[in-house]
């Protein structure tokens, strides 16, 4: 088994009130020249977790923009609960992972529109 040490959280940059399904996100990534969706997991607003790419661990939640299109933490309670459950499971499988946001690797990005390190830095202690 390969050793995973980093989990990157993304947002889809989808305004509140606009739906971007897993299939829509996949189609958009392929249209932009990717071979497949760019994420390992995609969490829709209802908290449903969809599996995407198999060769990396990037988690994307549907949202990240307010109704004006401004970057904002738009996670629903269902998305927050699903993200915690998913991160706990990934931590169980890959105990050495560090959870970061996309902007922690590229400061030019707002994504995921919240401070993932502050929120999930104590991953083993998540409640």
Segment roles from a protein language model:
Residues 3-55:
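Secreted/periplasmic proteins that engage bacterial cell-wall peptidoglycan
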